[in-house]
């Protein structure tokens, strides 16, 4: 015979597992929510590797960045509102334009999107 407390514990464990599982959403890669996650990772990476970004900028002076990104890098508060409205193609250009995109940024962006329950799909 199964004790009622065992059943209650099992139900609670299942409920906790369901509550802990993030909801998933499939979005276009150009959706602003995707862009904000990407830019959040990008700003964090710049902060962590500032000297590397300065060297890259010095070697590629024609590569420009939206002023909102520079402001977000040096503003240690909530910067997400600063980054809204940057066009998706500009987000893609600045993020994929650095040599460490494939090795450092892309995996970090994928992880951050997955953690937020966001998956991207190319629109048909």
UniProtKB/Swiss-Prot annotation:
Residues 1-20 form the signal peptide. GO terms for biological process: fungal-type cell wall organization. PROSITE patterns: SRP1_TIP1. GO terms for molecular function: structural constituent of cell wall. The keyword Signal applies. One of its GO terms (cellular component) is fungal-type cell wall. Keywords: Signal. It comes from the Eukaryota. Belongs to the SRP1/TIP1 family. Seripauperin subfamily. PANTHER family: CELL WALL PROTEIN CWP1-RELATED, SERIPAUPERIN. This is Seripauperin-15.
């Amino acid at each position: 015979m199964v004790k009622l407390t065992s059943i209650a514990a099992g139900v609670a464990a299942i409920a906790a597992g369901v509550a802990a599982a993030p909801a998933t959403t499939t979005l276009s890669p150009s959706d602003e929510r995707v862009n904000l996650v990407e830019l959040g990772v990008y700003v964090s990476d710049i902060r962590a590797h500032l000297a590397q970004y300065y060297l890259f900028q010095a070697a590629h002076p024609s590569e420009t960045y939206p002023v909102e990104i520079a402001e977000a890098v040096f503003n240690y508060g909530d910067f997400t509102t600063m980054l809204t409205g940057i066009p998706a193609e500009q987000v893609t250009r600045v993020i994929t334009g650095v040599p460490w995109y494939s090795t450092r940024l892309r995996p970090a962006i994928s992880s951050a999107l997955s953690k937020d329950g966001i998956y991207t799909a190319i629109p048909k």
